């Protein structure tokens, strides 16, 4: 028994005061503000997610229950899970569960690919069980029904007719599970090839044939993309998934500006402890940068990821309470206790008028919107239309100039330390809402890094 871990989880649960926030699923796009997701009671839903891709295939039921309870205690309300997995780094060559149960009972004649029209009841019964555990913990599951990094070949060998039938099976089976969003794709590099797109679209359309209750989205290609880059998915998706391993502000704003009628969220960026070639990796500081950039560029939330828990590598339990997920919780609490859903990105710098750094539109390499993280000093800022809340994230410290007339008085100004979950008062606060004011954060936060969040709000604030 790991007493320190149990204690930390208990404290986290107290800190978040009911981290699941009682969302009434299924989610929908807000009719009043299509930039955000809401639950069935029209309560704004901030996506605070993890990415345990191999949850169903690599954990037992008991391990799944422990993992889900831990994530709920950390304030996580959403998970990305792949329904079937073939790649050895995530699952097993035959895609089986830990007990050897395979997802399908037959293969396509003359191939090694599963026949998608022959689902194995025992496999999907396990999926059902874990889905109910997630619901008990108040957690939304973003199900990838046929992840394209490993199963595109299988989809092509099945063809569109079988793929649609598979989707119909899923739609019928899961239409009454409230806590679902259907998330297609996954490193879908070749989506622009019509035959590839057609079979994955067929799965989605099959689901929609029997399930009109749940939203759909799709992850396209790395290193940077959004769902709406593929026009064939525009009639299907109700949520625009931004994907980038570069500074997130560029891709999130790209997705935000593609459509005012559906929300955007960051579906994948750098994972904690992970670093691939030509990527910056997932240190706590980089995770904070991508998270706060994302939130102040108009997103309805984001998914975190962890090298040890997306694959469930040996010893994954030792990484459940990592700095990255703890600081993700700090971020979530900062926004959840404020009207984050009314924030509008300050793209034209009428709010933060100077000191906002350089917006890196590309590279190096040239295909990298946002560029690398090291030295990236772009300040993302957002403001509510009524002027009751303004926020800015300063990744490298420095001094910014704020147009105080955009805010309502009296203006309480504080610095939030995103690494330590503490506020620091600013001399002279509260301020009048006239003229401009220069704000300079303390030199270093509690982690010894230069990033801070400026929080300006009418009255005393939460």
Sequence positions of predicted segments:
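Boundary/junction segments of secreted and surface-exposed precursor proteins
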Residues: 22-29
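Proline-centered flexible-loop/turn and helix-kink motifs
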Residues: 175-178, 212, 260, 336-342
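Aromatic- and carboxylate-lined catalytic core of secreted/periplasmic carbohydrate-active enzymes
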Residues: 23, 43, 272-274, 287-429, ...
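A generic structural motif
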Residues: 51, 429-430
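Bacterial N-terminal signal peptides that target proteins for export
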Residues: 1-11
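Extracellular glycoside hydrolase catalytic/binding regions
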Residues: 186-326
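Active-site mouth of glycoside hydrolases
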Residues: 30-250
């Amino acid at each position: 028994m790991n007493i320190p871990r149990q204690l930390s989880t208990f404290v986290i649960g107290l800190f978040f005061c009911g981290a699941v926030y009682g969302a009434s699923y299924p989610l929908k796009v807000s009719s009043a503000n299509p930039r955000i997701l809401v639950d069935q009671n029209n309560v704004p839903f901030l996506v605070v997610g993890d990415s345990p891709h191999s949850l169903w295939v690599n954990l037992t039921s008991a391990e799944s229950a422990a993992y889900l309870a831990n994530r709920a205690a950390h304030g996580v309300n959403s998970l990305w899970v792949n329904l079937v997995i073939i790649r050895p780094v995530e699952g097993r060559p035959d895609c089986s569960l830990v007990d050897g149960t395979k997802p399908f009972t037959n293969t396509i004649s003359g191939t090694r690919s599963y026949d998608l029209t022959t689902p194995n009841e025992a496999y999907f019964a396990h999926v059902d069980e874990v889905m109910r555990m997630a619901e008990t913990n108040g957690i939304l599951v973003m199900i990838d029904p046929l992840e394209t990094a490993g199963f595109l070949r299988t989809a092509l060998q099945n063809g569109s007719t079988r793929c649609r039938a598979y989707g119909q099976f899923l739609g019928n089976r899961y239409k009454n599970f409230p806590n679902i969003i259907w998330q297609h794709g996954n490193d879908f590099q070749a989506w622009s090839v019509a035959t590839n797109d057609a079979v994955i679209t067929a799965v989605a359309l099959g689901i929609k044939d029997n399930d009109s209750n749940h939203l759909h989205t799709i992850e396209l290609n790395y290193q940077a993309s959004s769902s709406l880059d593929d026009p064939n998915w525009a009639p299907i998706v109700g949520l625009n998934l931004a994907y980038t391993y570069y500074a997130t502000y560029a891709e999130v704003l790209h997705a935000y500006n593609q459509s005012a009628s559906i929300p955007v969220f960051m579906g994948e960026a750098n994972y904690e402890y992970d670093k691939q070639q030509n990527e910056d990796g997932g240190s706590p500081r980089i995770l904070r940068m991508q998270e706060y950039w994302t939130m102040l560029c108009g997103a309805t939330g984001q998914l975190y990821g962890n090298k040890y828990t997306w694959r469930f590598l040996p010893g994954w339990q030792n990484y459940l309470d990592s700095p990255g997920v703890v600081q993700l919780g700090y971020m979530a609490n900062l926004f959840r206790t404020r009207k984050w859903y009314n924030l509008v990105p300050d793209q034209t710098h009428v709010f933060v008028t100077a000191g906002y750094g350089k917006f890196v539109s590309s590279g190096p390499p040239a295909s990298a919107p946002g560029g690398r993280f090291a030295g990236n000093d772009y300040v993302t800022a957002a403001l509510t239309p009524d002027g009751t809340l303004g926020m800015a994230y300063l990744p490298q410290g420095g001094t910014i100039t704020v147009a105080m007339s955009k805010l309502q008085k009296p203006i309480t100004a504080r610095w939030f330390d995103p690494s330590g979950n503490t506020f620091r008062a600013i001399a002279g606060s509260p301020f009048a809402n006239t003229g401009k004011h220069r704000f300079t954060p303390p030199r270093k936060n509690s982690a010894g890094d230069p990033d801070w969040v400026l929080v300006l709000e009418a009255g005393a604030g939460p």
